[in-house]
């Protein structure tokens, strides 16, 4: 049994050693991928019968807890950290840095919220407000996201740019990002465009908790730029920062008054720890 799972644990161990910090969602995804790529047909069913449970969950527990180890070759990532509302697991002998947590958060955000997932929601919203999409494209955030750590483990992240036009004086350049956490890097100059518009909008997905939004609001000034939050499952948009001049946009938000009240409450009542 250990021999059969050895390639799986080797693959997962190499990944853990490379990054040191992995989100729960990404770890579960890598476990699934390793089982699909390393086990032959019939091996998984036989192992699950022998072990009395689903392999994905058994391997996840083997990696992230001290109990129920399936093999001495199982990676050990029992150190658990909550960062910005997401759960992360770290190697116990690894002195993680804040940059590694940030990179792990960005990796998972890009996996679970690719910009394409939100594009149709945004396009439908703009059409309802009377706009036509005249230009769109995928652009890269070509930069070292996390300094020296990211130079060693470089990732390329994409965002989508839309140019929506309603009339000669109503046109918007809209950028769709995988997370609010990417916006500071865009603001630093890595997402410049030749497209000129009278207003900029950044659309980001919802998060598990308000923490990433509160951190962003407290640490960054976006000037005249608006930020909208998209709920992919409900196919809705609501404002986070800024008030649109076009009443047709305002009237198509799902619940703008409630969204703005929530932002006000977050700012007054919640404290975000520094990492």
Per-segment meaning from a language model:
Residues 16-17, 99, 104, 110, ...:
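A sequence-composition feature that detects small, non-aromatic residues
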Residues 154-156, 171-173, 178-183, 192-275:
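Charged, structured surface patches that assemble and position nucleic-acid processing machinery
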Residues 188-189:
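Conserved mixed alpha/beta catalytic, RNA-binding, or beta-rich assembly cores of soluble enzyme
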Residues 2-20, 25-71, 75-86, 91-159, ...:
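Acidic-basic catalytic patches of nuclease active cores, encompassing PD-(D/E)XK
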């Amino acid at each position: 049994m250990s021999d059969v799972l050895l390639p799986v644990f080797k693959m997962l161990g190499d990944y853990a050693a490379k990054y040191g910090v992995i989100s729960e969602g990404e770890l579960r995804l890598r476990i699934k991928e390793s089982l699909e790529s390393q086990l032959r047909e019939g091996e998984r069913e036989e192992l699950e019968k022998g072990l009395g449970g689903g392999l994905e969950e058994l391997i996840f527990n083997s990696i992230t807890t001290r109990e129920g180890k399936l093999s001495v070759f199982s990676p050990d990532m029992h150190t658990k950290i909550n960062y910005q509302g997401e759960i992360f697991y770290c190697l116990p002998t690894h002195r993680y840095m804040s940059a590694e947590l940030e990179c792990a958060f960005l990796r998972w955000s890009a996996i679970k919220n690719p910009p394409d997932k939100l594009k149709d929601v945004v396009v439908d919203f703009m059409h309802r407000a009377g706009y036509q999409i005249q230009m769109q494209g995928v652009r890269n955030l070509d930069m070292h996201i996390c300094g020296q750590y990211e130079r060693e483990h470089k990732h390329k992240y994409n965002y989508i740019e839309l140019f929506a036009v309603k009339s000669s004086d109503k046109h918007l350049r809209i950028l769709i990002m995988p997370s609010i956490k990417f916006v500071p890097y865009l603001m630093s100059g890595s997402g410049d465009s030749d497209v000129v518009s009278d207003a900029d909008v950044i659309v980001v997905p919802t998060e598990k908790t308000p923490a990433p939004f509160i951190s962003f609001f407290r640490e960054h000034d976006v000037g005249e730029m608006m930020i909208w939050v998209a709920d992919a499952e409900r196919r809705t948009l609501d404002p986070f920062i800024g008030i649109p001049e076009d009443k047709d946009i305002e009237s198509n938000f799902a619940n703008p008054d409630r969204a703005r009240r929530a932002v006000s409450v977050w700012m007054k009542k919640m404290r975000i720890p520094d990492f």
